[in-house]
Amino acid sequence: MANVDMQTFDKIIVLDFGSQYNQLITRRIREFGVYSELLSHKLTAAQIKEMNPKGIIFSGGPNSVYDDGAFQIDPEIFELGIPILGICYGMQLMAHNLSGGKVESADNKEYGKAIITVKNQENVMFKDLPETQTVWMSHGDLVTQVPEGFEVTATSDNCPISAMANDAKKFYGLQFHTEVRNTEYGNDILRHFAFDVCQARSNWSMDDFIDMQIQKIRETVGDKKVLLGLSGGVDSSVVGVLLHKAIGNQLTSIFVDHGLLRKGEAEQVMDSLGGKFGLNIIKVDAKERFLNKLAGVSDPEKKRKIIGNEFIRVFDDESAKLEGIEFLAQGTLYTDIIESGTDTAQTIKSHHNVGGLPEDVQFKLIEPLNTLFKDEVRELGEKLGMPHELVWRQPFPGPGLGIRVIGEITEEKLEIVRDSDLILREEIAKHGLDKEIWQYFTVLPGIRSVGVMGDGRTYDYTVGIRAVTSIDGMTADFAQIPWDVLQEISVRIVNEVDHVNRVVYDITSKPPATIEWE
């Protein structure tokens, strides 16, 4: 494998101002085959110049540019001669910093779909696109006067300056979010910026990522040993195969059966990763240990912290039996980082790979997937030669069924979720919907209700079905499963799973809900 020089790849950087959508921008750019990464808005112009990017994108964010403490930038960035695209807050920041621009609080705030009218279809950003377009707005402020040298290129009923452009300087602003799928021509607009404005080359691929990560892992680890916690999910499995490819037997994997796994999962992990790929796996039966720690705990954040901490404790116990372990590998993804919050984004919920680590953790962390989205992880798995059925398994959180049993966890509740989830997966696959639906699972909300079975009255649990369509997990719509399929699933669950007399279907999108219930 040849060493990979990052300077050979054209790059567009995204400066982070705190939008929950900001990492989607990097994802969209990468889809074009152009390398992109999300970086701090605190970077100086000199630091950016050293990186030699083809373009810069200012992300959206929750601030008002005119407020004290609002996220700002080094104004010298505008003097670098590098194309800049400002999205939402990024556009307002551009107007606020450049002479003649003005930003004010909007009389009518916009959150959701809106219709824009393109005023200049000759402008490079809207080239070959319709005059009217559906876009996704999410703003409380707006640009009321464009800076000197700019023209208004699009407008909407509630946002007279929906887009602006200075072709001479190659500065562009969009009040709407091109990175969100609800923006009809968002990808086309970003593509125009990447290729027509920035003149970037499409020379980045997953093969390059593999080469880079293997090189980075080897440089980081040296001759030391790495410990990996296998959860049974796609992410940790891909991390295991990638690390094994990079460092071979320097990797020891610990598979903790914490009693919170899906039906038959422990056996599948040992057979596929231990057998086919030859990973050195130590299996630990810690079911009683985890359930004792979780007894009486109902708060979802506390459950996540307990599970995350206990995983580390198990690793401590097992690593004490091993020599030379210095690193702990985790399957943290981009979406985990953003949902756990950064210095610019509020925490939605702590992720088990991010917020559950104790302060006295004994290992240095390796997180080779923390710049990838879920769909990229699946692509990576297939590039590594992993079985299709393993790579395309349903996403499964590190805390396992511990966050699919709402409230206090008991063995009876876990069995209900295991059995009902298996039925759901069987029926979805039987009806050929497993590739159409991005994620599907059952939850136990902890609700009991009255029912009638046979000649008797019952007072049993309700099972919830969650099924969503998505590209990367950042936004999601509930899957419109045919009614007859839902009926079959419901009938099977009520008849085959003990202590269940009602099945409900979650029809909430993300946002406002998250995909998991806890």
Curated annotation (Swiss-Prot):
SUPFAM superfamilies: Adenine nucleotide alpha hydrolases-like (SSF52402), Class I glutamine amidotransferase-like (SSF52317), GMP synthetase C-terminal dimerisation domain (SSF54810). It is an enzyme of class 6 (ligase). Disulfide bonds: none annotated. It catalyses: XMP + L-glutamine + ATP + H2O = GMP + L-glutamate + AMP + diphosphate + 2 H(+). The active site is at 88 (nucleophile), 177, 179. Its EC number is 6.3.5.2. Catalyzes the synthesis of GMP from XMP. This is GMP synthase [glutamine-hydrolyzing].
